[in-house]
Amino acid sequence: MKTEQLFIENTPAVLYSEPSDTLWLFVHGQFGCKEEALPFAEIVSPDAQVLSIDLPNHGTRQNRDEEFAPWTAAPELTRVMAYARAHWRATNVRATSIGAYFARLAFAAPEKALFVSPIVDMERLICDRICAAGITEQILRERGMYPAREGDMLSWDYLCWVRAHPAKDWY
């Protein structure tokens, strides 16, 4: 499989397969990395190329002072999709979990989209996690941050951002 490492602005990326007019942008989920796209590239090649990036604080970008949050990931994906649309005739998306959510924030629906375990309603997910933590939104608002059962933190600012920036409806 032909593999090319590149940067789109400052974003590390990998491009799989021989040149084609068709591209699949592969967006990994939490704890993922750009190299996860290889098995998918093996399936869609030679009819399409696959472009994958490391989202903030993932893959080759781990341990940097970057936040894995929608306000950092979505603008980056907007830039990557603009690059893709400038270089390929057809651009599609294959995204996993929170990667699907970030993609829906970042750009309008592509011709084709394949989602694996997508987060389709981030606000609902956060509210369910608030309930599971045994607190109310008021408590989260007052404290700002609260430990979630899963080991990460619930954030009032994150919830407010999600409410102020609804994801685009692709379906």
What is each residue range found by the language model?
Residues 90-95, 116:
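Short beta-strand immediately N-terminal to the catalytic nucleophile in serine-hydrolase-like folds
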Residues 7-17:
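A short loop-to-beta-strand scaffold at the N-terminal edge of the catalytic core in hydrolase folds
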Residues 21-29:
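Short beta-strand element of the alpha/beta-hydrolase
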Residues 30-42:
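The serine-hydrolase catalytic nucleophile loop
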Residues 36, 67-86:
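Alpha/beta-hydrolase active-site loop
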Residues 94-103:
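Gly/Ala-rich beta-loop-alpha elbow adjacent to hydrolase catalytic centers
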Residues 110-171:
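The alpha/beta-hydrolase serine catalytic core
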Residues 44-63:
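Conserved alpha/beta-hydrolase
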